[in-house]
């Protein structure tokens, strides 16, 4: 995974809530980066799809365009604009498969139930999907290419733990589909490694002091993971011990970047400072938190190792542990010391 990670808060779910978490659905806001005032919903052959606004549902047999019209939603080809939320599902069983797209921008397949509601200048799309579908989708999107199965299983446990413990990160839905929460793409097919990793670890989560841990992870740590305190982040219950990552220490992912004087003045050794610069200058401006610096020709040159915040699971290091025979449990124990893996 080469994408920089945003802060993932280390929230915790009380142990008493574990028994209530079975068969949960996850509400994920999708395609929000585009802030679009129109969304096209297309059926998939063999998958029933119907929509409703509170009255009788109508079948969707061809692409349906929903457009924002003032504070209402107009469906292309209809006479009236609708108040409130449009709900789309299979009818009888609820979840179904469909494609949601932003015209001229992106089209993505989903499995679940779709909600579309009007906001001030855009339409808000939320997919309500089964927990394990969401886990498999994130594993497919977040994991490095060709990661071994045990590394994917470790990722699945971390992903599921985050979904259970960090619910409610957004006002209108629980999670977004970007690295602010967890990156999500189309659900993988049943023959894929990501699907099998989620299935093999179904229901397993990380526990610390009888609470589910919202597990943080990043692409590569540079040889040693960070604590929350080192990056100016508050302690929410799990201390995130700094651990050595042998693979990244031997073969660190190196980078060099150059900052203008005015930008360098805003750089501090914290995750929030790095992210603020990344939003301004682009995600490759300061790829990670482990770096040295020196002045050169009126600029500040950063020479660093590691990509992402470097807290918790190192995906690059975990993949190497798996290639050398470590199980997903051993990988998780290495990067999240003093935790347990249990069925939720």
Describe these PLM feature segments.
Residues 2-10, 18-344:
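Conserved, single-site charged/polar hotspot
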């Amino acid at each position: 995974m080469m994408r920089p990670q945003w802060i993932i808060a280390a929230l915790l779910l009380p142990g008493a809530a574990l028994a209530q978490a079975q068969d949960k659905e996850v509400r994920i806001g999708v395609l929000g980066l585009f802030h679009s005032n129109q969304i096209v919903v297309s059926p998939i052959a063999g998958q029933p799809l119907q929509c409703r606004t509170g009255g009788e549902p109508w079948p969707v047999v061809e692409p349906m365009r929903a457009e924002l019209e003032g504070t209402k939603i107009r469906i292309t080809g209809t006479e009236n604009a609708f108040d409130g939320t449009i709900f789309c599902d299979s009818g009888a069983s609820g979840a179904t498969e469909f494609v949601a797209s932003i015209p001229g921008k992106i089209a993505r397949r989903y499995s679940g139930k779709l909600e579309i509601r009007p906001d001030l200048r855009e339409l808000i799309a939320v997919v309500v999907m089964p927990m394990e579908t969401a886990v498999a989708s994130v594993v497919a999107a977040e994991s490095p290419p060709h990661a071994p199965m045990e590394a994917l299983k470790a990722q699945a446990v971390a992903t599921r733990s985050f979904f259970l413990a960090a619910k409610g990160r957004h006002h209108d839905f629980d999670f977004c589909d970007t690295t602010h929460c967890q990156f999500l793409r189309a659900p993988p097919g049943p023959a894929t490694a990501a699907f099998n990793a989620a299935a093999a670890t179904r229901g397993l989560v990380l526990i610390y002091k009888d609470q589910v841990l919202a597990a943080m992870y990043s692409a590569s740590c540079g040889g040693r993971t960070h604590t929350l305190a080192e990056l100016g982040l508050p302690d929410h219950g799990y201390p995130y011990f700094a651990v050595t990552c042998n693979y990244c220490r031997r073969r660190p992912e190196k980078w060099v970047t150059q900052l203008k004087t005015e930008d360098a003045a805003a750089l501090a050794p914290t995750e929030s400072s790095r992210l603020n610069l990344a939003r301004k200058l682009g995600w490759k401006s300061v790829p990670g938190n482990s770096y040295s610096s020196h002045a050169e020709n009126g600029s500040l040159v950063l020479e660093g190792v590691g990509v992402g915040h470097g807290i918790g699971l190192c995906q690059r290091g975990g993949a190497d542990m798996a290639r050398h025979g470590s199980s997903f449990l051993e990988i998780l124990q290495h990067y999240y010391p003093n935790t347990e893996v249990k069925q939720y």
